[in-house]
C-alpha cells in the first residue's frame, strides 16, 4: 500500500469518497468546518491509501485537541476523523494500516496520543483494541420519545441570546464544572467556534440553573454541551425538541447514566480509544487515565 499525506487539491475527491462510504456525510461546507478549522493552532491532516497499482483504497484524517487533567497538566491528542474504506478494498487490512499511519503522523508532530471514537459493534473498535488502545466506555444516546410518547415532568426551557455575556458565563461555568475531570480544553474563541459557530442553527438554552447548547440539523437535534445530564434536565430538553417534531442525540462518558433501561432512549455502547506512540511510550496509561478520575467528553467535542 502507498500513502499520500495532505495531497494538494484533493478535498473534493476526499469528500466524494466519504459520502460513498457514509451516505449524506456532508457537503464542502461540512468538510471545511471539520477539516480546515485550526484548533490548538493545528489544522487537520489527512491522507489517502492507494494500492501498488495506484487504485484508490481508503482515506483518513487526524484532527487535534488538548486533553486537560485535574492536575492542570494537558496532553495534545490526535483524533482519527472521517476515516473511510471503499467497498472494493474491504477485508484488505486498510484500517489496520490507517491506524499505523495515523500513529506515525501524530508521533512526528510530537503529539502524545492517537484517539478515536468508535461504537462497540464497529469493526474499527476491534482493530483499535487489538492495536493496544486504552478504552474509555462511552454511550451514544438517542431519544425515541416521539414513538413512546412518554409524559415527562415539564421544566421550563428558555432560549438565550448567543451574546458575549451569556457565552462567557457558560464558558466559565464549564471550566469550573470540569476541574476535577479529564476533558477537552479550549480557550474562549475555540469554545465558541466549536460549540456555537457550527454548520446548522445552534441554540443556547436554559433549564432552571442549567445550560445546554443544541444544534438543529435537518433530521434531528444534537446536544453538544450540557451542564447537567440529570434525568430531569435531559427529559426537559427532549420535550422541547419533540415540540419541533424531532428527536435528539447526545454522548456520554458516564457508563452509569440514567438512560440505559428507558424505552424512550436508545443507547449505543462504544469507546473513546487512546493509543500511545514513541512520544508517550514511557507513559503508564492505567496511571495517567486512572479509573478514579472521570472523563467528561460531550457530543460537541467530537468533531
Protein language model features and the residues they cover:
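Long, hydrophobic/aromatic-enriched structural stretches that serve as scaffold segments
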Residues: 61-71, 75-98, 102
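Amide-forming acyltransferase catalytic core, primarily the GNAT-like/NAT-type
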Residues: 13-44, 107-109, 130-232
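Conserved beta-strand in the GNAT
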Residues: 47-48, 55-65, 79, 84, ...
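Active-site/acyl-donor-binding loops of N-acyltransferases
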Residues: 64, 117-156, 212-303
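Conserved acetyl-CoA-binding loop-helix of GNAT-fold acetyltransferases
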Residues: 85, 90-106, 116, 230-242
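Secondary-structure boundary elements
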Residues: 51-54, 104-112, 123, 134, ...
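Tryptophan-centric aromatic hotspots in well-structured domains and transmembrane helices
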Residues: 31-37, 95, 117, 293
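Non-cleavable N-terminal signal-anchor transmembrane helices
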Residues: 1-76
